[in-house]
């Protein structure tokens, strides 16, 4: 009887369930979208119960549609949109407010106040993060401050906090397990990544009672089992948890110090495994936990690119220059260069290493001879220049020269982007056969905990290369192009509308 690992990939706009076999191959997929709520400008919320319903639906669908019995599921792995925050009543199981999503800016004033009080470096030193609304801690404080009676309930021990992984494990286990893993805890602004414990000083600054917080566990461990009615009477081990970007790092088998993966999604995320050392960044990177396994944690450096694949969506939906994302490749390859055109897609500011929230998108180098093909090519090239910006910051902070770049996300299907990426970073780019690396990482973590796979070496054998892109551009051309990009970014930062 063939066994499978069921991976739950709970994302920002949809929930997915994916079955993986022992070779790490996909045996079935189900997906369901859920509603986004925007109560005010800059606020983004989800209904945690709707997320739970969507997860139940896709788990049921993937099992039924692929004729898999519940007793064929060896374990469940969970990967989740990071930082999104749920607070719920531990007696009724009902959330007391919507889940506040990672993108939501409704806690900006809390962050500004803490910065004015001089606490930014305290948070940076202990958590490796920036004092920003992106992270979970200020979201918890906002809920306790703004929902009537919440603070009193929290102090009486009646409320629980969790990121989405915690919420799903609690529900799946029938309220038995209130846990998170090291990778998700490291995104809360409340967890000391050096001591590996919730930090009393930070909790006091955020006025969050410690009794609300989940127990922090390794990323690969049996946390509990499903209760009867979810799996037709089967008690299936819930055995692996990691935040989405860390799960992708694990799914790419980036197990060694210096291994790097880059995800080209709506935005871009690059993570470097820095081994057992938390590398302090001087270049605007985040220091975070990659995963905890085998009794120790691996740390990572993380760089964020705000606009990656969404630049291609902009070409399609905003400018109507292309009818589909794949069409961008054929247009880009009709010309040999951009003829000096640069697109800086700072639609919502610039991420690592600039962290300039006021910058806005800009185009440079236009001439009467500029055609649609040049413009499209320049937009695709911008993804690669931004990736080099982050990679250079990583090499500077870590002292490690990146030997190869493993890639995933929607834009990796574009061969032009992959080749230009290799050229502009002067490093081989490796595209895997299975590009569902986030879900695969969660499956690997769960599979290790239940003996489905024996070791990380066993897992590494399952990682298969689809295509390798080696750099072909000569150094003079590469550096000339990159100098042009840096000038374009500099000019973008100078021009600010009032």
Curated annotation (Swiss-Prot):
GO terms of molecular function: ATP binding; glycerol kinase activity
Binding site for sn-glycerol 3-phosphate: 12, 82-83, 134, 244
Alphabetized UniProt keyword annotations: ATP-binding, Glycerol metabolism, Kinase, Nucleotide-binding, Phosphoprotein, Transferase
Gene Ontology, cellular component aspect: cytosol
Top-rank taxon, per record: Bacteria
HAMAP family documented for this protein: Glycerol_kin
Protein family per UniProt: Belongs to the FGGY kinase family.
Stated name of the protein: Glycerol kinase
């Amino acid at each position: 009887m063939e066994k499978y690992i069921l991976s739950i990939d709970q994302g920002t706009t949809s929930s997915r369930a994916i079955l993986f076999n022992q070779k790490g191959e996909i045996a079935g997929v189900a997906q369901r979208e859920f509603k986004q709520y925007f109560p005010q400008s800059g606020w983004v919320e989800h209904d945690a119960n709707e997320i739970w319903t969507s997860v139940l639906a896709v788990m049921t669908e993937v099992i039924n549609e692929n004729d898999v019995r519940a007793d064929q599921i060896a374990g469940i792995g969970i990967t989740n949109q990071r930082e999104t925050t749920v607070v719920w009543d531990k007696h009724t199981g009902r959330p007391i407010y919507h889940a506040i999503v990672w993108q939501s800016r409704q806690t900006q004033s809390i962050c500004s106040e803490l910065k004015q009080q001089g606490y930014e470096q305290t948070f940076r030193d202990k958590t490796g993060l920036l004092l920003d609304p992106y992270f979970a801690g200020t979201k918890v404080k906002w809920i306790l401050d703004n929902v009537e009676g919440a603070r009193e309930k929290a102090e009486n021990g009646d409320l629980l906090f969790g990121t989405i992984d915690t919420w799903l494990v609690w529900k799946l286990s029938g309220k038995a397990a209130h846990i998170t893993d090291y990778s998700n805890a490291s995104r809360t602004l409340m967890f000391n990544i050096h001591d590996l414990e919730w930090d009393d000083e930070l909790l006091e600054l955020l006025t969050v009672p410690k009794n609300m917080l989940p127990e922090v566990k390794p990323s690969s461990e049996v946390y509990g089992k499903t209760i009867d009615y979810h799996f037709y009477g089967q008690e299936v081990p819930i055995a692996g948890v990691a935040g989405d970007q860390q799960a992708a790092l694990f799914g790419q088998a980036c197990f060694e110090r210096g291994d790097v993966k880059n995800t080209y999604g709506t935005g871009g995320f690059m993570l470097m495994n820095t081994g057992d050392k938390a590398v302090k960044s001087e270049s605007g990177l985040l220091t975070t936990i990659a995963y905890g396994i085998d009794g120790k944690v691996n740390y990572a450096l993380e760089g964020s690119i705000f606009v990656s694949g969404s630049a291609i969506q902009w070409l399609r939906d905003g400018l109507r220059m292309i009818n589909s994302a794949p069409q961008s490749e054929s247009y880009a390859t009709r010309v040999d260069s951009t003829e000096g055109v640069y697109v800086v897609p700072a639609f919502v500011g610039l991420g690592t290493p600039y962290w300039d929230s006021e910058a806005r998108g800009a185009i440079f180098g236009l001439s009467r001879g500029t055609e649609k093909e040049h413009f499209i090519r320049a937009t695709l090239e911008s993804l690669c220049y931004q990736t080099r910006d982050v990679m250079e910051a990583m090499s500077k902070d870590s002292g490690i020269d990146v030997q190869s770049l493993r890639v995933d996300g929607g834009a990796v299907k574009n061969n032009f982007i992959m080749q230009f990426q290799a050229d502009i970073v002067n490093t081989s780019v490796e595209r895997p056969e299975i590009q569902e690396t986030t879900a695969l990482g969660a499956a690997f973590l769960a599979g290790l905990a239940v003996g489905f796979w024996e070791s990380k070496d066993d897992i590494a054998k399952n990682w298969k290369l689809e295509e390798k892109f080696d750099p072909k551009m000569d150094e003079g051309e590469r550096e000339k192009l990159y100098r042009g990009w840096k000038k374009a970014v500099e000019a973008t930062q100078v021009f600010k509308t009032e």
